[in-house]
C-alpha cells in the first residue's frame, strides 16, 4: 500500500512513523493551491490512499487582521482540500481520502477566525463528499504537539497535547474503514477519549465509540 501525504507536517511524520516498516509513505511539499502541481503529484505516485495534512494558521484578531492572511488560510486549508479531492476522484473515485481538520472548525476561537472558518469548511466539505458516495473522512484533533501549535501557543504545557502518532493511529483506522464515509472523527487529549459523530441531522451532539486512547504514561 502507498499513502501519499500532502504537506510536510509533524502529523505526516507521525503517519510515516506508524507505517515505517510496512507501507510506502511519500510526503509531498507541492503548493496545494495549485491544481497542476496536485495533478502531477497524484499522477507521479498513484497512491492507494491520500492524506491531506497541509495547513496554515495566522494568529490575529478580526479588527487587526489582513485580507492576505485570511485568504491564505482559506486557500491552503479549504481550497487545497477541494483541489486534492477533485484530482483524486478524477483518477480513482474509490480511493480513501483523509483530511486533517480541527476542533477549531467546530466552534469559533479568538484570534483564529480564519483558521476556524477554513477548518469548518473542510469538515462540511468532507461530509458532502461522503454523501456523494466518496470514501472521505475528516479528523478533528484538539491540541497536537506540532511546530504550528508551538508557534501559535508558545510556552503551552506540551503534556496537554496529543502526540502526532495518536493522530496517525486515527488515520490508520480511517484507512481500515472503521468509520463511515463523511464522518468527522474528533480526538481530544482531555479524558483520553475518541469521539465519532454519527447523527447527520444534528452534528456534534451524538457520539459513539467512546473508548480509551491510552493512559497518561503513554500519551
Model-derived features: where do they sit?
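Active-site loop-to-helix junction immediately N-terminal to the catalytic Tyr of the SDR YXXXK motif
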Residues: 65, 108-116, 128
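Substrate-binding pocket helix/loop in short-chain dehydrogenase/reductase
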Residues: 61-62, 69-71
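Canonical Rossmann dinucleotide-binding motif of NAD(H)/NADP(H)-dependent dehydrogenases/reductases
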Residues: 1-21
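Residue(s) in the substrate-gating loop at a strand-loop-helix junction
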Residues: 102
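Active-site helix of classical SDR
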Residues: 85, 118
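C-terminal helical subdomain
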Residues: 138, 155-204, 208-213
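Conserved NAD(P)H cofactor-binding loop of Rossmann-fold oxidoreductase domains
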Residues: 53-59
Amino acid at each position: 500500500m502507498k499513502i501519499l501525504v500532502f504537506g510536510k507536517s509533524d502529523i505526516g511524520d507521525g503517519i510515516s512513523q506508524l507505517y515505517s516498516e510496512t507501507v510506502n509513505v511519500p510526503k509531498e511539499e507541492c503548493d496545494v493551491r495549485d491544481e497542476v502541481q496536485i495533478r502531477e503529484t497524484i499522477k507521479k505516485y498513484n497512491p492507494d490512499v491520500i492524506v491531506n495534512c497541509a495547513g496554515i494558521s495566522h494568529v490575529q484578531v478580526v479588527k487587526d487582521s489582513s485580507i492576505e492572511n485570511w485568504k491564505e488560510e482559506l486557500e491552503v486549508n479549504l481550497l487545497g482540500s477541494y483541489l486534492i479531492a477533485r484530482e483524486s476522484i478524477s483518477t480513482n473515485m474509490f480511493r480513501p481520502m483523509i483530511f486533517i481538520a480541527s476542533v477549531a472548525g467546530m466552534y469559533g476561537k479568538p484570534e483564529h477566525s480564519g483558521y476556524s472558518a477554513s477548518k469548518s469548511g473542510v469538515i462540511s466539505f468532507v461530509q458532502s463528499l461522503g454523501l456523494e458516495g466518496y470514501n472521505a473522512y475528516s479528523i478533528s484533533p484538539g491540541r497536537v504537539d506540532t511546530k504550528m501549535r508551538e508557534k501559535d501557543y508558545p510556552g503551552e504545557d506540551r503534556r496537554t497535547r496529543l502526540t502526532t502518532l495518536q493522530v496517525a493511529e486515527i488515520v490508520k483506522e480511517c484507512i481500515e474503514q472503521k468509520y463511515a464515509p463523511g464522518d468527522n472523527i474528533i480526538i481530544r487529549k482531555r479524558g483520553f477519549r475518541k469521539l465519532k459523530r454519527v447523527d447527520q441531522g444534528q452534528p456534534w451532539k451524538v457520539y459513539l465509540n467512546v473508548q480509551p486512547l491510552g493512559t497518561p504514561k503513554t500519551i
